[in-house]
Amino acid sequence: MIHFDQVTYFYPEASRPILDRVSLDIDEGELILVIGPSGSGKSTFLRCLNGMVPHFYGGRFAGQVRVAGLNPVEREPRGMSATVGFVFQDPEAQFVVDTVEDEMAFAMENQGLSQTLMRKRIEEVLDQLSIAHL
């Protein structure tokens, strides 16, 4: 489901890579925890999954990333948003609304989905995850 092959990434103006020849495979349904000290590349690693690295940040990127068969480097982040999402360690700095339902709606509104489809998807996900109370 997620495949990294020799991924190396330098931020602009950096003399050392933040990711250096990272190779790994994560299978569908597998649960992983991305941990490490501040500045170790955790967020950069995650941003490779949705294409924010290198599209938004620039810099030098080498290697291959695949997520559900898609190449985030070849696609724009908008094209990956239906497949990849994540919450950073400080969700207060990331979320723009107060409820899970409104946050889900905000993301789908940005994708241009109809109100009817948004309502259906929100209800399905809230029920599947048993988080309708949030």
Please identify what each model-predicted range represents.
Residues 1-4, 9-21, 53-58, 74-76, ...:
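A short, flexible loop at the N-terminus of ABC-type nucleotide-binding domains that lies
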Residues 26-28, 79:
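Conserved hydrophobic segment flanking the Walker A/P-loop of ABC-type ATPase nucleotide-binding domains
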Residues 32, 43-56:
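Short, conserved post-Walker A segment of ABC-type ATPase nucleotide-binding domains
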Residues 35-37:
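The feature captures the beta-strand-to-loop junction immediately N-terminal to the Walker
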Residues 50, 85, 92, 98-109, ...:
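Short helical segment in ABC ATPase nucleotide-binding domains corresponding to the A-loop/adjacent helical element
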Residues 51, 64-79, 114:
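ABC ATPase NBD Q-loop/coupling interface
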Residues 69, 116-134:
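Conserved ABC ATPase "signature" region
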